[in-house]
């Protein structure tokens, strides 16, 4: 049975401390910051912002921290008080999800998140969209006047994802989205990127 994460967010019950505990101490602090002319040049980055998810069975908004290094992703959701509600660590072939003090493991992070929480979120493509890039099978449907992507369609089983890049900003020397809306039948995800920092990887 999926975990009621909206209930968890409201009551903040039995949430364990985790590796990703919010903005006061982040994984990105272990790396030197880097300026890039294009976001795709960054092999590692960290993001701080907010995420709001609305589905037929759930609705919530919370803080988001995301650390990306190559094919590895580590993200956490925290309340306004800094309490960690959910953490998800993934690398090829292995994903670990912590919520309500329990750990769940699967080979695919997207399948794991949906099985535990009931959320259908396109995690595989999010690192690309967050940095303003396009997936292999994505089709750009509109551009802003300045030439930056305004919207795209991403093929998916049952219903395609409609991705809207509502606004853009300059971070770490590159143009990256400020606000993104991702939606398909019955599901809407909004991400606000307050800080995106490119990081220098260790040689």
Curated annotation (Swiss-Prot):
GO biological process: one example: lipoprotein localization to outer membrane
Q: Where does it localize? A: Cell outer membrane
Q: Where is the lipid attached (S-diacylglycerol cysteine)?
A: 23
The principal location of this protein is membrane
Q: Would you tell me the protein name for this molecule?
A: Outer-membrane lipoprotein LolB
Q: Which family does it belong to?
A: Belongs to the LolB family.
Signal peptide start and end residues: 1-22
Gene Ontology CC entries for this record = cell outer membrane
- How does this chain assemble? Monomer.
- How does this protein sit in the membrane? Lipid-anchor
Keywords from the named record: Cell outer membrane, Chaperone, Lipoprotein, Membrane, Palmitate, Protein transport, Signal, Transport
From the broadest rank down, the organism's phylogenetic lineage runs:
Bacteria, Pseudomonadati, Pseudomonadota, Gammaproteobacteria, Alteromonadales
The UniProt entry, under Gene3D superfamilies, shows: Lipoprotein localisation LolA/LolB/LppX
Residue numbers with lipid attached (N-palmitoyl cysteine): 23
Main function: Plays a critical role in the incorporation of lipoproteins in the outer membrane after they are released by the LolA protein.
């Amino acid at each position: 049975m999926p975990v009621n994460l909206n209930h968890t967010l409201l009551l903040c019950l039995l949430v364990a401390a985790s590796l990703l505990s919010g903005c006061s101490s982040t994984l990105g602090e272990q790396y030197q910051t880097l300026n890039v002319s294009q976001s795709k040049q960054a092999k590692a980055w960290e993001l701080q912002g907010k995420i709001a998810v609305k589905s037929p069975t759930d609705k919530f908004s919370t803080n988001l921290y995301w650390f990306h290094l190559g094919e590895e992703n580590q993200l956490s959701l925290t309340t306004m008080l800094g309490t960690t509600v959910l953490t998800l660590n993934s690398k090829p072939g292995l994903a670990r999800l912590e919520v309500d003090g329990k750990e769940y493991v699967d080979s695919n992070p997207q399948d794991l998140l949906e099985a535990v929480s009931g959320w259908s979120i396109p995690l595989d493509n999010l690192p690309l969209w967050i940095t303003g890039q396009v997936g292999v099978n994505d089709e750009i449907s509109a551009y802003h006047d300045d030439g930056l992507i305004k919207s795209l369609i991403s093929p998916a089983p049952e219903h395609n994802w409609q991705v809207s890049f509502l606004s853009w900003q300059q971070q770490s020397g590159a143009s990256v989205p400020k606000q993104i809306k991702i939606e398909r039948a019955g599901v809407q995800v909004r991400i606000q990127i307050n800080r995106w920092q490119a990081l220098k990887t260790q040689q």
